[in-house]
Structure formats: C-alpha cells, structure tokens
C-alpha cells in the first residue's frame, strides 16, 4: 500500500494549520474501539510515506483491551507486525482541543502491502465491492443513542445521569423524552458537538432527549457511501466523548449502563438501489412481492432457524 499520492493532503494540512503540534492516529478493532498512538507534527509526513508498524495482536483484543489467546495471534505467531496506512481524506482538525490537535484514521495491511481481512473496515470494503459487481449501491445512515453521565458515582457506587450544564438541573429519576427544555440545559455541549462534526465534514442532524434520564439520540444524514457512513459514526462517538469531557461529563455508549431504566441502541438505516437509482425491493409490474425482497426475507429467516 502506498499513499504518496495523498502526501499533498498532509502537506496542505500542515500549511493551513501551523498551530497543530500532535495527531491522534486511530485504527478500529472488531469491537469498534479506537486504538493507536499520538504522534508529533514532525512525524506526520513520514507516516504518509512509510506507514507505521503495529502488533498483529491489536486486531484480536477484546472489548477491554486484553489479548485474546484463542485468536492464535500471540504465542502461535509470535505477535508479528502489521503496517497501518492513513485513510485518504480522514485527516481532520479536532474542535476545541487545547493546544490544537489533529486526527486521522488508519487502515491495516500485512507487511507485504496486502489488506488484512481481519481489519473490519477492509471486510466492509470487500463486501461493498461484491455488491457493486451485482450493480447494487447503497443509501445509509445511523442514529446514535447515548447517555451523558456524571463523573461522580451515586451513593451505591453506580452511574448516574449528568446534571444539565446550564442550571445544573438533575434528571436522575425524571424522563424528559422529546423535552426541548432539557436539551437547552445541554446546549453548550450540543453546540460543540455540532461544531466538531462540521470540522470533520460529518452531516449531523437532529438531536433529541431520549426516553431514559440523561439519554440522547443524534442522527446523521443519509449518504451514498456506506464506507464513509461507517467512518462517520466511529468518529462521531469520539467527538461526543471528547466534547463531553470538555464540559465535565462522560459520554457512555453501553447498551445498558444503568439498571431499571431504558438502554441505548444504534439504528442503522440502509436502502439498496440499482444502477437506475431504483430501490431493488420495490414492487414492479404489479407483482405481488418483489423477488429480491422475498429472497432477503428468506435469508433473514434462515438466520433464526
């Protein structure tokens, strides 16, 4: 893998952002956890020229960051090296970071330059190519639910919803679903999230106060690039975490961080279209049921048999 063609991307970024002194270089494992390093400004161009080596076991860690011996990547293979390369167009300026910093995402390859199939982004890219060979394209979007929790635990040592930033109004036992007033209490944080997504060229749209206390949902605009949609949702989680820390609260994306109240999910909306921009599941010529839809339903049914 060579990214010399994209070297100008890094050069132009450095020229435009002379105040940036360091960069987060981030890869995502199979659990969606961002792993990587912080590099200094003087290392960026060489990263684009030569890549950066990482241990192979990085791809086999569990959600807590522990090695998983069952993968066979540790003792059996001696935890060899892989090489990470910058993903084109992923170099972004981080909002509200002091001193100013940048961030870029990385893709993983073996030492010979072949894409690693254990990199989840490479897996997705291969599947997209399979669909393209069949003349199928996508529209996709995510809706992300999350909690904003206090940095302090309750009297029982458990998580509790964060108080509003403005006014410090507590919402520990009160559900404020669709409450605009509740959102107003978090406006400084919400505004920073929107500013950060704008810098990252992520089309963030509606935010609501969700059903559980301290729970929110932020939607992203649908787009044709399924790969960018996946990159955007991973970056959005990093943005929300970072901006929450700036405002003295913690963002939590766990499915069920607090018992006895609703948990969080992540809705993924996807539509499949042919080369003429027509939905492949739509009925045509007065047919009773579209054959593609019939096959899709059959495939989903087989999963549960």
Q: How should these model regions be labeled?
A:
Residues 215, 220, 228-298:
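Acidic, glycine-rich loop-and-beta core segments that form the ion-binding/anion-interacting portion
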Residues 125-128, 194, 237, 241, ...:
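Generic solvent-exposed, charged/amphipathic alpha-helical segments
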Residues 225:
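Positively charged, low-complexity, intrinsically disordered RNA-binding extensions
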Residues 1-206, 228-232, 249:
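ATP/Mg2+-dependent ligation/transfer catalytic cores
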Residues 303-305:
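Conserved small/polar residues in nucleotide/adenosyl-binding loops
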Residues 144, 210-218:
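Short, conserved phosphate-binding/catalytic loop or strand-edge motifs used
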Residues 151, 209, 256:
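Residues that form or immediately flank small-molecule/cofactor binding pockets and catalytic motifs
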């Amino acid at each position: 893998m060579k990214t010399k063609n994209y070297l100008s991307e890094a050069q132009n970024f450095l020229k435009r952002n002379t105040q940036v002194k360091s960069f987060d270089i981030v890869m995502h494992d199979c659990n969606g956890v961002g792993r990587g390093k912080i590099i200094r400004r003087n290392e960026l161009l060489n990263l684009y020229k030569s890549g950066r080596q990482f241990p192979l076991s990085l791809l086999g860690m569990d959600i807590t960051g522990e090695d998983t011996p069952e993968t066979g990547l540790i003792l059996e293979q001696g935890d060899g090296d892989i090489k990470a390369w910058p993903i084109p167009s992923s170099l972004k300026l981080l909002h509200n970071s002091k001193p100013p910093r940048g961030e870029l995402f990385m893709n993983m390859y073996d030492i010979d330059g072949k894409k690693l199939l254990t990199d989840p982004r490479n897996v997705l890219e291969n599947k997209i190519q399979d669909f393209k060979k069949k003349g199928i394209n996508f529209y996709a979007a995510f809706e992300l639910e999350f909690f904003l929790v206090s940095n302090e635990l309750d009297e029982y040592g458990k998580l509790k919803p964060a108080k509003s930033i403005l006014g410090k109004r507590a919402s520990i036992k009160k559900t404020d679903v669709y409450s605009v007033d509740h959102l107003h209490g978090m406006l400084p944080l919400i505004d920073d999230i929107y500013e950060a997504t704008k810098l990252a060229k992520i089309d963030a749209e509606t935010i609501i106060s969700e059903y559980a206390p301290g729970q929110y949902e932020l939607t992203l605009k649908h787009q044709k690039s399924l790969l960018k949609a996946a990159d955007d949702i991973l970056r959005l989680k990093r943005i929300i975490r970072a901006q929450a820390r700036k405002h003295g609260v913690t963002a939590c994306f766990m499915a069920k961080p607090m018992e006895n109240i609703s948990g969080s999910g992540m809705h993924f909306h996807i539509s499949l279209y042919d080369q003429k921009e027509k939905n492949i599941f739509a009925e045509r010529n007065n047919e009773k049921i579209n054959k593609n839809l019939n096959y899709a339903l059959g495939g989903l049914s087989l999963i549960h048999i």
